[in-house]
Amino acid sequence: MRAIICKDWGDPDTLELGELPEPALGPGQVRIRMRAAGVNFADCVLVRGQYQEKPDLPFAPGLEGAGEVMEVGDGVTDFKPGDRVMAVVSAGAYAEQAVCEATTVFHIPDGMDNMTAAAFPVAYGTSHLALVHRAKLKAGETLLVLGAGGGVGLTAIECGKALGATVIAAASTAEKLELARARGADHLINYAEEDLRGTLKKITDGQGVDVVYDPVGGALAQTAMRSL
C-alpha cells in the first residue's frame, strides 16, 4: 500500500512517499481505508523518536484519520464494512489503510466531511476527556484555558461552552484571542501584555477559577494553578 514513511528518526521533512505492507488485522480491530488524516504536534514528536510510543522503523506516522471500514476483526460488532468512521490510530493514518482498535473508532455524523472528521478525534477527544471525565466541569463553573489559540485550546473553549461554563481564554497574541472569541470565549487575556493572576482576580471578583486547562505546561502553569 502507498504510505508516507518514516525510515529514520528526524524532522517531518525527512518523510518519504513509498510502499509498506498492509497491516495485519487482529481480534477487536478495524481496518480502515483512509481518505484523510489529521496533522498534530504529536506526529512531529513521533517521527523524531521522542513520543511516548516508539514504533519499529520503517512505519507510517499519523495518529488520527477518517475513511471507510474495509473489514473488522473477530469480536467487533459496532462496525461493518462501508461504515464511515474516524479513528485514533497508534500510528499509520498516513497510509492507504490503517488498522486500529475498535474502541478508538467512531462513526462520522451525517453532514461531517472526511477532512473535518480526520482532524476531530485527537484535539476534541483530549478536551472532552480532560473536561468531562477528569475535571468534571459543570454548568455555572469558570474555566481558564491557557494556550487558547492552539488547536487543543480552541476545542477546550467549545467543550467548556457546551457544558455551560464561563470560559476565560488566555493567549499570547491578539490574533489568537480573536480565534478564541470566535469559538465562544467569554473573557480574553493577553498574557504577553497583562498580568494573568491580577486579571483573573478582576474577572472573577477575586473568587478564582474552578478549572484550569493547560495544554502548554509552560511558565504560567503555576500562576494559573494559584488562581484556582
Feature annotation, model-predicted:
Residues 42-48:
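Cytochrome P450 core scaffold surrounding the K-helix E-X-X-R motif
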Residues 21-39, 50-92:
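Glycine-rich beta-strand-centered segment in the early N-terminal region that forms part
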Residues 79-80, 137, 228:
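Short, well-ordered loop/turn sites that connect or cap secondary structure elements
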Residues 3, 34, 98, 127, ...:
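Terminal peptide-recognition signature
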Residues 119-194:
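Mid-domain Rossmann-like dinucleotide-binding core that forms the NAD(H)/NADP(H) cofactor-binding site
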Residues 33, 45, 56, 84-147:
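NAD(P)H dinucleotide-binding glycine-rich loop of Rossmann-like/cofactor-binding domains
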Residues 183, 187-228:
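Glycine-rich cofactor phosphate-binding loops and adjacent beta1-alpha1 units
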